[in-house]
Amino acid sequence: MANEKFIRNKTHLNVGTIGHVDHGKTTLTAAITQVLSARGLAKSRAYDQIDNAPEERERGITIKTSHVEYETEKRHYAHVDCPGHADYVKNMITGAAQMDAAILVVSGADSVMPQTREHILLARQVGVPKIVVFLNKCDLSPDEQILELVEMEVRELLSQYDFPGDDIPVIRGSALKALEGDAHYVAQVNKLIETLDTYIEDPVREVDKPFLMPVEDVFTITGRGTVVTGRVERGQVKAGDEVEIVGLKETRKTIVTAVEMFKKDLEFAQAGDNVGALLRGINREDVQRGQVLAKPGSVKPHSKFIAQVYVLTKEEGGRHTAFFSQYRPQFYFRTTDITGVVELQGDVKMVMPGDNAELVVTLNNPIAIEEGTKFSIREGGKTVGAGSVSKLLN
């Protein structure tokens, strides 16, 4: 039997729950599905179904993640919840689950905790555009003044990391009580869902962003010219478009004279398509794997940047020992490995397997990167870490 068709009649949004361990992220995820299933918009998922997350691999790293989907009258949501703190760090840094928005869950009974801070910082560094706060376990802390203080503390923390702390919606509730059917708390979960629909704008679809395609392979078609193949990362391209070849060498302009998919001419290619693009006046040796084709002026080559990285543990197949400044691994961006030198930041003297660290990286060759670009760190073809560019330095 054919798989059920995905009906695209609503805007799709990716969200995730973040926050300190045991503050109620998974319980809230279960409560959202239960409340929406009562309106016929979701399948109710029990706590242990979500908590029993399957393992996935992204950029050579194993991550436990639960994916839950639900709809509102306005949107279709894909919601990601991770069981362990390390899974969150890995998930956000590798971009395994790109979030258009995050629901920060803070226990009203415990207030801000270390991972609350760490998850907000990560959300800032990997470019999560919007955060909504759910103050959970308010049934355990009925004192209004205490809840006011907790809310104030959360808002201050968000402002500290450049989120609009004063304007972010904070919804008070109890995920557990909502699951038990308490009418007041069910209404608060409904209020959270309504807030997701109204406070978070529709994301700009990848198709509408400026064209970019990493070059995977290059070959010559006799009598026609040079063809580069790859998967369109974002935007669209059609015959007659001017593009730039960016990275590794001097940036060059050319015209795309044809776009093909599975040996058939395409009117245009868009984000997600695997295509071949025929380039005018370009020799085979002018372009190579690791470069990108991009809309002119949309992306520049860079070789020095600040990155947020997660270093794999020995058990995850990573290094057995720490590394220091002047460490020289390969950085795998999109389709290629480039050697680079690492400098540790601040008073950090070494980075241990399992650490989440900020590094300055200088690559041997400039390549097309932007803030938010993801990469793997490799040694001899083996993944030892994953990172995200947080700031360009040249």
Curated annotation (Swiss-Prot):
Question: What ranges does the record give for the region G4, renumbered to this chain?
Answer: 136-139
Residues holding Mg(2+): 26
EC numbers, comma separated: 3.6.5.3
Q: Where does GTP bind?
A: 19-26, 81-85, 136-139
Recorded family membership: Belongs to the TRAFAC class translation factor GTPase superfamily. Classic translation factor GTPase family. EF-Tu/EF-1A subfamily.
Q: Which residues does the UniProt record annotate as the domain tr-type G?
A: 10-204
| Protein's job | GTP hydrolase that promotes the GTP-dependent binding of aminoacyl-tRNA to the A-site of ribosomes during protein biosynthesis.
Question: What binding partners and quaternary form does the record give?
Answer: Monomer.
Pfam families in the record, alphabetically? GTP_EFTU, GTP_EFTU_D2, GTP_EFTU_D3
Q: Does the keyword Chaperone apply?
A: no
Reaction it catalyzes: GTP + H2O = GDP + phosphate + H(+)
Q: What is this protein called?
A: Elongation factor Tu
State the species of origin. Answer: Aster yellows witches'-broom phytoplasma (strain AYWB)
Report the gene name: tuf
Q: Where is this region: G3?
A: 81-84
Single GO term (MF): GTPase activity
Instruction: Check the record and name the InterPro entries matching this protein.
Output: EF-Tu_GTP-bd (IPR041709), EF-Tu_GTPase (IPR050055), EFTu-like_2 (IPR004161), EFTU_2 (IPR033720), G_TR_CS (IPR031157), P-loop_NTPase (IPR027417), Small_GTP-bd (IPR005225), T_Tr_GTP-bd_dom (IPR000795)
The answer, when asked if Cell cycle is one of the entry's keywords, is no
Highest taxon listed in the record's lineage: Bacteria
Protein keywords:
Cytoplasm, Elongation factor, GTP-binding, Hydrolase, Magnesium, Metal-binding, Nucleotide-binding, Protein biosynthesis
Which parts of this chain are annotated as the region G5? Answer: 174-176
Cite the Gene3D superfamilies for this sequence: P-loop containing nucleotide triphosphate hydrolases, Translation factors
The segments labelled G1 in the record are 19-26
**Location in or out of the cell:** Cytoplasm
Q: Identify the stretch(es) annotated as G2.
A: 60-64
Question: What GO terms fall under cellular component here?
Answer: cytosol
